[in-house]
Amino acid sequence: MEELKLNIEAIRTQMKLTRLEMAGRLGISVDRYNRLANGESKMLATELVCLHRISGVPYENIDVPEKS
């Protein structure tokens, strides 16, 4: 059975944070967050680690799409 993968927006919504709050927790600008959420930029390994740590979502359940 395939595990459900959550993207950065789904995780933010589950955490009940605004984009500004999520960007702050990730240590990135809101513009950078928006580019990640819209698939315009590829997530860096450091951002993935931070997202995992603040959300508790296992790495393998975080959807990290390639840059379009």
Over which residues does each language-model region extend?
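A short, Lys/Arg-rich alpha-helix, primarily the initiator
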Residues: 1-14
